[in-house]
A protein has these predicted regions:
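Active-site-proximal binding-pocket segments
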Residues: 224-425
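Active-site "lid/cap" and pocket-lining segments within catalytic core domains
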Residues: 1-271, 281, 388-505
Length: 505
């Protein structure tokens, strides 16, 4: 019996384990609700609902091929053991996964179980991540070669094992998860993923390069494929393939004298971000400890002892007194998605202005990001917190972000309605309104909307002083060289950056 173990690859096209297993006889298409993952701090009902939507569509697709999903709940090796007792498993087929500590430990158990039971476990690559990589030399070339390979077709048919209980979809309440109160912007499933890709490449993405930073325009201008990629409803290679075709079409149109608008620059920007997807995942693959520890050990102890639960809770619920911070956090809590620039701002604010160690905010955000991908998430959080030791220190100004990204307050007033009557000119710093202005706007600071939790300039200066006290040390520079050697991109300069940016950001 062949077992195809579906995890974060909930699709039938470009699925090599499925394609290969179908050649070898009777198959079980298995998905396991893993209790340890579901009960983890990073898991949310929104994740569960998205997965169930994807599983329902996957099951229908498999039925059209003559098979179906077999759904189980429990610890993976126990489930495999029960199946193995019923029908001896010849080969376990799956994709490689670069996940969190829970999935890493689980994979070690599966490896031991397969060896003990003489079951062959075949894992296949589905991203640009390379296992057992010594350094980043040549990584980009290997990633690009992987992305240029032919898309794997859906099997013509799958011979199913017919005498196993199929199981069913399990709702969130069966795992003790609360009812989903969020209005997700993205649905699960392979069809939705391809619809999003097509609408982005043909319509929505024309001004991606200039509209992706503002939360006002990002919802339409961004691809919104991140959750579909995370849960494997579409592969990065499928996206790259479609992107290459679209780039070719646009270049040809330009040669033919047709207007192409901003398409070429936008498609180039999108291409770069697809590469970054694999680049950041590779960091966690190479050094799993960065899920829990500072990438650069020079920053150990920098913030850990100063953690303020009061500040953290205000940040979590969007009551910091900074409109852009609060609007973004409330939007995220409502929709499970916010654009990248605003994610970076949220982490920067928690790390620098509130001086919170990155780990607890990272877990909170992971729970609310529908597209939570451990390799990208923990690498990015550390980058925005300044603990990689090699990246530019970016201290985002929450005041400047209002002026740059939402000058008319469209986004802010939607998600922070208590500021609806505040004139646009006061939205960056509503606490500076006079008493008469507060009265006229119907928003009293300290009653209807909080005072700033910290003073921006004071917090900025203190954070800059403290982090640079560490960065200028010789031991920190030596540690930075180690980090660059292990994780640094080989496309540009590899020296640790000494720049600080407050407002670019």
């Amino acid at each position: 019996m062949q077992v195809i173990w579906f995890k974060k690859d909930l699709r039938t096209e470009d699925h090599r384990p499925l394609f290969e297993a179908a050649k070898h006889g009777s198959c079980v298409c298995l998905y396991i609700y893993e209790s340890e993952l579901i009960q983890s701090a990073e898991y949310d009902t929104s994740h569960h609902d998205f997965i169930n939507e994807s599983l329902a569509e996957l099951d229908q697709s498999l039925r059209e091929l003559g098979s179906h999903l077999v759904l189980r709940v429990g610890e993976v090796t126990q489930v495999l053991g029960e199946l193995h007792e019923r029908h001896p498993i010849e080969t376990l087929w799956s994709h490689e996964e670069t996940g969190n500590g829970i999935t890493y430990a689980r994979d070690q158990r599966v490896k031991a179980w397969a060896k003990a039971n003489q079951v062959q476990w075949k894992e296949y690559v589905q991203t640009g991540v390379v296992r057992c990589l010594k350094n980043r030399d040549g990584w980009s070339r290997a990633r690009n070669q992987m992305m240029s390979k032919k898309i794997i077709a859906v099997p013509e048919s799958i011979q199913a094992v017919t005498d196993l209980e199929r199981g069913r979809l399990y709702d969130q309440h069966e795992f003790g998860l609360p009812k989903n109160e969020k209005s997700r912007l993205i649905a699960g499933g392979e069809k939705t993923a391809h619809q999003l890709l097509d609408s982005f490449l043909r319509n929505r993405g024309q001004h991606y390069s200039r509209e992706m930073s503002s939360p006002v325009t990002a919802h339409d201008a961004c691809s919104r494929l991140s959750a579909s990629i995370t849960w494997g409803c579409i592969s990065v290679r499928q996206i790259v393939s479609a992107l290459r075709q679209r780039q070719e079409d646009v270049r040809q149109a330009k040669k033919d004298g047709m207007p192409t608008g901003g398409w070429l620059s936008s498609l180039k920007s999108f291409d770069a971000r697809l590469s970054w997807h694999c680049h950041f995942m590779q960091k966690l693959e190479d050094e799993p400890r960065i899920e829990f520890e500072n990438m650069s050990r020079s920053y150990d102890g920098l913030r850990e002892s100063d953690f303020s639960q009061e500040r953290f809770e205000a940040w979590c619920v969007g009551h910091t007194g900074y409109p852009m911070i609060d609007a973004c956090m409330r939007a995220l809590r409502q929709h499970s998605w916010i654009n990248f620039r605003m994610r970076a701002m949220l982490v920067s604010f928690s790390s620098y202005h509130l001086w919170l160690h990155w780990r607890q905010p990272a877990i909170y955000l992971a729970k609310h990001f529908l597209d939570f991908e451990p390799g990208i998430h923990f690498s990015q959080v550390q980058m925005q917190s300044g603990t990689t030791g090699i990246n530019t220190v970016r201290i985002y100004s929450p005041i400047k972000q209002v002026k740059d990204q939402d000058p008319r307050g469209e986004f802010i007033k939607q998600y922070v309605p208590e500021l609806a009557g505040v004139p646009d000119k006061h939205l960056p710093e509503p606490h500076k309104m006079s008493r008469d202005e507060q009265n006229q706007s119907g928003c009293w600071i300290g009653r209807d909307y909080p005072e700033p939790i910290v003073d921006h300039l004071t917090a900025y200066r203190a954070a800059k002083e403290r982090i640079y006290a560490v960065r200028k040390q010789a031991s920190t520079r030596e540690e930075a060289r180690r980090v660059v050697k292990k994780h640094g991109s080989r496309k540009g300069p590899t020296q640790p950056s000494r720049r600080t940016r407050q407002s670019a950001s």
